[in-house]
Amino acid sequence: MPRSLKKGPFVDHHLLKKVFEAQESNSKKPIKTWSRRSLIVPDMIGLTIAVHNGQQHVPVLMTEEMVGHKLGEFAVTRNYRGHAADKKAKKK
């Protein structure tokens, strides 16, 4: 179920504070965050945010198409390497 419109978008306060500081200083340094639950707002466009995926921070450049999505959608947490190969099929 989507979030109620009267509540507005959710962005962690510490992340929003870092975004405004980066905009004021025109910093190109990535903003590190563990807040995968935060929504991408128009203020973040053009910034690089390093989103934690459980092991490392994945740098994500914010674009206009990403507005309305959550940060965690762009930092994959699972690493699928394929199914184990069948030994009998390899010998043939």
UniProtKB/Swiss-Prot annotation:
PROSITE patterns the UniProt entry points to: RIBOSOMAL_S19 (PS00323)
Listed GO CC annotations: cytoplasm; small ribosomal subunit
The entry's keywords: Ribonucleoprotein, Ribosomal protein, RNA-binding, rRNA-binding
Cited SUPFAM superfamilies: Ribosomal protein S19 (SSF54570)
Any GO MF annotation of the entry: structural constituent of ribosome
Superkingdom of the organism of origin: Bacteria
Similarity comment: family membership: Belongs to the universal ribosomal protein uS19 family.
Function of the molecule: Protein S19 forms a complex with S13 that binds strongly to the 16S ribosomal RNA.
HAMAP family named among the record's database cross-references: Ribosomal_uS19
Database matches in NCBIfam families: rpsS_bact
PANTHER family per UniProt: RIBOSOMAL PROTEIN S19P FAMILY MEMBER (PTHR11880), SMALL RIBOSOMAL SUBUNIT PROTEIN US19M (PTHR11880:SF8)
Protein name as catalogued: Small ribosomal subunit protein uS19
Originating species: Francisella philomiragia subsp. philomiragia (strain ATCC 25017 / CCUG 19701 / FSC 153 / O#319-036)
